[in-house]
Each structure stands twice: as C-alpha cells, then as structure tokens.
Amino acid sequence: EMRRKALWRLREEQPEGQRRLGAQLKHDISVPPGKLGEFIDSAKEICNNLLPGVRINPFGHLGDGNVHFNLSPPKGKIDFSELDDEIYSRLAELASSMSGSFAAEHGIGRAKIIMADKLRDPIERDIMSKLKKSLDDVLNNVGLTWNNKIKALPKSQQN
C-alpha cells in the first residue's frame, strides 16, 4: 500500500514540479498502448532536434496509451513559445501516423480545431460534426464544428 501511495504521489506532483521549471508546452496525446514507447522515443527525438536541451516530461495514463507529453525550456532559456506551433504540429502528426490522437482525454475544443481539420479524415469530421450537433448544438462550444470556420484560440489563451 505504501508503494502504491508513493507512486501516485509522484504522478500527482508531476505538474507542480514542472511548473517550477518555468514556461511549459503541454501536449495531450494518445497512441495504442503497444506503441507508447515508440511514440515517446520518436517524440523526444523530434523535440531535441527542434530545441536541443529541451526538458521532456512524459507522464499520465500510460497504461491506456494516454500521455501528457509536456516540455520545459532548456536551462537558461525562459521562453520557447516561438516553437510551440512547430512542435505541436510534429507531435500531432506523429501520433496520427501511429493510429493515435493529438487530442486525448481533454478533447478537441477550440484550441485544436485546425489540427482536427488537418489530420482527420473528411468522413470522420462529418460524423463528428453531426454527432456533436445532435447531442449539444446549444450547450457546449456553440458553433464549433470541424470546418475551419471557427478561429482557434490564440496560444496565450489555451490551457
């Protein structure tokens, strides 16, 4: 029981520990559980090629293939937001290429709508749009559909 509690404490303290490192780029990714190790290795390589020394903190629901693939700046660098779009795009494409998703447990919402249009099959987008409309057309994210007509939130307003 003590070991279980200690492991949970480590998991629960991850976000706070990372906040102490400064700015963060957060990614909510899912891939089939059997591909998680491959995803993490490839994603680390992508991130290190784009920003040598970046501090990578993958954690989360690893048993079901969901991972918070969060990044903190290299030591001595305060802001690295200029690479946010490039890193996000590359990680999203990697996850999709592995039959995964760039929008795991936190969903698509307004922040990821453009990526959904870019990476999701048109038939899938159509089904998702019809399903959303039939379930909550007037409740949540009114007007948000998979058609690029809704402007994504600026990065500063996400998360």
Say what each PLM segment does:
Residues 1-90, 94, 98:
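C-terminal substrate-recognition/cap domain of FAD-linked oxidoreductases
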Residues 61-66, 101, 108-110, 144:
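Gly/Ser/Thr-rich helix-start
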Residues 79, 83, 87, 108, ...:
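Short amphipathic alpha-helical interaction segments
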Residues 96-108, 133-141:
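Alpha-helix capping/hinge segments and adjacent helical runs
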Residues 113-159:
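Activity-critical C-terminal alpha-helical subdomain
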